[in-house]
Amino acid sequence: MTQRGEVPDFLHGCGLPAAWAGLPQWRILETGFGFGLNFLATWAAWRADPHRPVLLHFVATEAQPVSAADLLRAGSARPGLAPLAQELSRQWWGLLPGLHRLRFDDGHVLLTLCLGDWQAQLRQQRQQLTVDSVYLHDLPQDWRPQRHPAPAGLPGLPGLKAVAACCRRGTRLASRCSTVRDALVQCGFTLHPAPGSDAQRDMLHAVYQPHWQPRTMRPAAAPATPGECMVIGGGIAGAATAASLARRGWQLRVLDQAAAPAAGASGLPAGIFAPHVSADDNLLSRLSRSGVRSTLEQARWRLREGLDWSHCGVLEHRADASPGLPARWSDGPGADGRQSAAHAALGALAQSGLPANASVCWHPQAGWIRPARLVAALLAQPGIRWQGACRVARLRRVQAPGAGPTAWQALDAQGRVLAQAPTVVIAAGAGSLELLEHRWPLQPVRGQVSWGLHGDPAAPLLPFPVNGHGHLVPRFPLGDDAQGPCAWVMGATFERGVEQMPPAPADVQAAHASHWARLQTLLPRMAPPLESAFAAARADAGLAASARAAQSWAAVRCTAPDRLPIVGPVDAAALPGLWVCSAMGARGLTLALLCGELLAARLQGEPLPIEHRLAKALDSGRM
């Protein structure tokens, strides 16, 4: 695979960087990512431009991604691109067929990779994907669309039609592919030949200006202008939504009934983020992989590794011996190197003390997080204002005088206005039910965990979490000293329809007993070190807990009937400006950051961070 042409020709052929000056965002489509040189050059130009757009979307197709080593080698050979190539190669993992969103420069440069059958993916995405520039990968000089199919990953006439469907009137295209002149004209492009650096072929410049009205044409509207927005809920879902919108220039006010953020389910002492795996690679598996990538990116940017989080991997113990990874996954950049992952799993299995024949799956791109630290870091971004100790009892829609826009008011129990904004996002977990006036069948789910202090901070403990039948984080620091007091946490119960807080003493004891039983199956090696803590909790039942006893922590989460998050407008026609990002259930650390990005993308009409069918599965319309 080669990257043809001089990189600047594509950039300048689309009138960049001048064309994007002063705009809130710019969207580029490239057919054939190759070694990523066009992306790297565009990224470098964006960085160097003081008038750059706030967001740079770069959507690229590729039939088969190259290795990270090849990517780095090609980028490092170009002056000025080596540092960017290194950043790109660090995120070059888990690239299975499908759509992947990679983020750079604090989320202001967004690379969306469409891998595999990219024409089908473009057709799926076209309702949300409208691009301003196209880098058309070139084809063999003797290729003729009437005689030969396009080589794998390169556009023939059907592919060019898929590209055209993603364009607006005025979208500019650059290519060295002189053999597609007629096909481009058929698809609605007006050609403007320009000399290229290759003496044998000219650089093609084209503008999408069809003389007909395509059935798939969408209004060439500017992206939604960032404005004011209220987010109701100060947990991980609300913080993720606020952070995603703030990066796009919105002014956010986050309201919560608690005085401090993360007072509900996001106040968990420590939790894990890890992908869900299934033999058929189902919807939740694909969704969780995208979610893990989003969580990893934010944790790297905003948290202190070893104190607030750890990218240590997670060992999944499948006690029921159910199948794990799909058999069709192969070694390479797609599956993160199945052979190397298998070796890592053997090493983790040996450390865990599980039997050699135990059914396990090693997740290298996973770890533990202290959720409250992540929430605080997200809410600390510019443009976000915290408004705590105010319980929103209901929402009221008000119409501005004359032709002014509709606004939403957040009211307390006495009917006093707490805040007002044209856009509001409900992200209040179990509290979303009341604000949505119980219009959807959301269900509260109480979760309890057992946790406690380690008596000896230097004691040798498993360096990574284990999940499966429950989950255990064997060790995490309680304060800001990695060598100071450390704790463990085991959980969690899933008590559907239970809202009572705090739990009754009998419920606490039942949860401790459940966690102790699960621990002996999940990770027998950790049972002896923690046995005294669980025994002390039983002995202290009904009394003040001793320092050595396992402690209880509980909160109420929220789930939808299908146990998937809900992201989208409540009722776009009847209730404009009212959105929801809720029902994370027990997967908030894995999915909330992704859901915040999905909501922001939908609100602003951007390219989606996940496949259209996954976004549809999360859409509020299913309620």
Curated annotation (Swiss-Prot):
Pfam families the UniProt entry points to = DAO, Methyltransf_30
Instruction: List, alphabetically, the InterPro entries matched.
Output: FAD-dep_OxRdtase (IPR006076), FAD/NAD-bd_sf (IPR036188), MnmC-like_methylTransf (IPR008471), SAM-dependent_MTases_sf (IPR029063), tRNA_S-uridine_synth_MnmC_C (IPR017610)
Q: Name one GO biological process term.
A: methylation
Q: Which UniProt keywords apply?
A: Cytoplasm, FAD, Flavoprotein, Methyltransferase, Multifunctional enzyme, Oxidoreductase, S-adenosyl-L-methionine, Transferase, tRNA processing
Q: Any idea which GO molecular function terms this record carries?
A: oxidoreductase activity, acting on the CH-NH group of donors; tRNA (5-methylaminomethyl-2-thiouridylate)(34)-methyltransferase activity
Q: Which reaction does it catalyse?
A: 5-aminomethyl-2-thiouridine(34) in tRNA + S-adenosyl-L-methionine = 5-methylaminomethyl-2-thiouridine(34) in tRNA + S-adenosyl-L-homocysteine + H(+)
tRNA (mnm(5)s(2)U34)-methyltransferase as annotated region, ranges = 1-209
Which family does the record claim for this protein?
In the N-terminal section; belongs to the methyltransferase superfamily. tRNA (mnm(5)s(2)U34)-methyltransferase family.
Name recorded for this polypeptide: tRNA 5-methylaminomethyl-2-thiouridine biosynthesis bifunctional protein MnmC
Q: Which organism is it from?
A: Verminephrobacter eiseniae (strain EF01-2)
- Classification lineage: Bacteria, Pseudomonadati, Pseudomonadota, Betaproteobacteria, Burkholderiales
Q: Which gene encodes it?
A: mnmC
